[in-house]
Amino acid sequence: MVEPYSQQKQIQQVVYRILDANLDRAREGLRIIEEWCRFGLNSGQLAGECKYLRQEVAVWHTEELRAARDTAGDPGTDLSHPQEEQRSSIKALLQANFCRVEEALRVLEEYGKLYHPKMGQACKQMRYRVYSLETNLMGHQRHQLLRRSRLYLVTSPSESLLPTVEAALKGGLTLLQYRDKDTDDFVRLELATKLRQLCHSYGALFIINDRVDLALAVDADGVHLGQQDMPIATARQLLGPQRLIGRSTTNADEMQKAIAEGADYIGVGPVYETPTKIGKAAAGLGYVSYAAQHSSVPWFAIGGIDANNINDVIDAGAERVAVVRSLMQAEQPTLVTQYLISQLNRIKPES
C-alpha cells in the first residue's frame, strides 16, 4: 500500500529530525573526547582521529536535515537520568560519551538508509572506527597513569581492607593491586568489585593479582602475574591490548624475559626479605640498580619497603615502589601514603 504524499512528507520530516538530532549527538560526543585527547593526554594522534571522525560525521549534516530541527517541540529535551547529572571520573566521562557516539552512529546507520543509499554504510564504518578509538584511548589512558604512578599498594587480607585502601587513595595513591590467595571466589568477586569502584572514583588504576578471569569479571585495569602464572601472551589474548599486564621478577634474566614477552610493567624484588614471599631470598639493592639501568618499561621495587628504608631504595635507582605491610598495617594510611609519595616525588618525573 502506497502512503499518501502528505503522509510521506510527514514521515520524511520525522526521519530528518532523527538524523539531525543524532548527528548533533555524535559530533558533540566526539568533541568532548577530542578535548581530553588533546589537553588531557597531549596525544595529537588520538585527537586527530577524533577530529577526522567528527568531520566525517559533519559531511552528512546537510542544510535540509538542519532545517527539520524542532527543538521547542522535542519532548526529549525534558528527559534526563540521574547518571547524566554527574560524572565520577574522567574514565566515566569518556565512557559515557563513547556510548553516546556509538549509539548515535547506530541510529544514523539505520535511519540514514532512508535518506541516502551510502549513509548507512558510512555510519557503520565510522561506528567501528569509534570502537577502535575507544580501545586505543582507554589503553593509552591506563599507560599514562601507570607511568605517572610512583607508589603501588598491593593489598593483603584485612578486616579493614576497604577503609585502608580509601585512606591511601585520599593520600594520593594512583595504583592498587588486589591480592588475596585464600578467600573464596564469591567473597573475592564482591571485594574486587567494591575496590574497583573505589579506585575508579578516585581516578586510580585497579589491578588484580594472578586471576585474569576475575580481572575481566570486574572490569579491572589489568592483571599482575607471578613467575608461575600463565604466559603473558595468553593473558594478552584474553585481556586485549587495552589492559595492563605486570610480571614479578627476581633477577636480570626474569626481567629481560618479561619485557620481551610484552609486560607493561614489572615488579623488581624482593628488595628485602618479607613475610609475603616466604622462603624467597632477597634480591637486594643490587637488582634495583640493575633495573634502573636496563629496564625499558616502568618498574616497581617491591619487598619489605617502608618509610624507614625507602630512601635507600631511591638511592639505588628506584623511581617507583610497591608496598604491602607499610600501608596495610599503618595506623594512619593517608599520612604514610603522602610521606612515601613525597619522597618519590623528589626524583625528577619521567617525561
UniProtKB/Swiss-Prot annotation:
Q: Cofactor note, please?
A: Binds 1 Mg(2+) ion per subunit.
Q: Where is this region: Thiamine-phosphate synthase?
A: 130-351
Query: What EC class does the entry list?
Result: transferase
InterPro entries linked: Aldolase_TIM (IPR013785), ThiamineP_synth_sf (IPR036206), ThiamineP_synth_TenI (IPR022998), ThiD2 (IPR041397), TMP_synthase (IPR034291), TMP_synthase_cyanobac_bac (IPR016229)
The alphabetized UniProt keywords are: Magnesium, Metal-binding, Thiamine biosynthesis, Transferase
Q: Which cysteines are joined by disulfide bonds?
A: none
Binding residue positions for 4-amino-2-methyl-5-(diphosphooxymethyl)pyrimidine:
Q177, Y178, R179, D180, K181, N209, S248, K277
Q: Which GO terms describe its cellular component?
A: cytoplasm
Question: What CDD domains would the database entry show?
Answer: TMP_TenI
Q: Which biological pathway?
A: Cofactor biosynthesis; thiamine diphosphate biosynthesis; thiamine phosphate from 4-amino-2-methyl-5-diphosphomethylpyrimidine and 4-methyl-5-(2-phosphoethyl)-thiazole: step 1/1
- EC no. given is 2.5.1.3
Q: According to the UniProt record, where is the region Unknown?
A: 1-129
> GO terms for biological process?
thiamine biosynthetic process; thiamine diphosphate biosynthetic process
Name the Pfam families on file: ThiD2, TMP-TENI
Q: Which SUPFAM superfamilies did the record assign?
A: Thiamin phosphate synthase
Task of the protein: Condenses 4-methyl-5-(beta-hydroxyethyl)thiazole monophosphate (THZ-P) and 2-methyl-4-amino-5-hydroxymethyl pyrimidine pyrophosphate (HMP-PP) to form thiamine monophosphate (TMP).
Q: What is this protein called?
A: Thiamine-phosphate synthase
Species name: Nostoc sp. (strain PCC 7120 / SAG 25.82 / UTEX 2576)
Q: Provide the taxonomic classification.
A: Bacteria, Bacillati, Cyanobacteriota, Cyanophyceae, Nostocales
Q: What gene name is given for the protein in this entry? A: thiE
